[in-house]
């Protein structure tokens, strides 16, 4: 079915793919993106692991109402999450050679 050495080659390829995925996950965890809201007046720096590393709020907003600042922070966090997802999808696409996965399925399985 697999031919001469086919099964061994298949196992070797699977192991190499697993190693590349591990390396890619490490790179993604180290990656940082910046989400913005309010024309850059609120910025959220987020790691590829989705942990928030820093929140910057322009001094001019400190005189505005609390609710507006909270809304802008939430919008900036959501923007950062979206950017992490886009970068992760792009990097994983490079790894898988553009192989499309079923909706909702993420790597690693």
From Swiss-Prot:
Function: Binds to DNA and alters its conformation. May be involved in regulation of gene expression, nucleoid organization and DNA protection.
Gene3D superfamilies reported in the protein's UniProt record: Nucleoid-associated protein YbaB-like domain
GO molecular function: DNA binding
Claim: DNA-binding is one of the keywords in the record: yes
Entry keyword set: Cytoplasm, DNA-binding
Low complexity: bias regions: 11-23
Annotated source species: Aeromonas salmonicida (strain A449)
Family from the record: Belongs to the YbaB/EbfC family.
Main location: cytoplasm
Descriptive protein name: Nucleoid-associated protein ASA_2087
Subcellular location: Cytoplasm, Nucleoid
Gene Ontology, cellular component aspect: bacterial nucleoid; cytosol
């Amino acid at each position: 079915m697999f031919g001469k050495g086919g099964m061994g080659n298949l196992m070797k390829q699977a192991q190499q793919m697993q190693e590349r995925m591990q390396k890619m996950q490490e790179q993604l965890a180290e990656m940082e993106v910046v989400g913005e809201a309010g024309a850059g007046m609120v910025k959220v720096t987020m790691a590829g692991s989705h942990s928030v590393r820093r929140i910057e709020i322009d001094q001019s907003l400190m005189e505005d109402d609390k609710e507006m600042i909270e809304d802008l922070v939430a919008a900036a966090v959501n923007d950062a999450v979206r950017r992490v997802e886009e970068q992760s999808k792009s990097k994983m696409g490079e790894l898988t050679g553009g192989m499309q996965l079923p909706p909702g399925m993420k790597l690693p399985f």
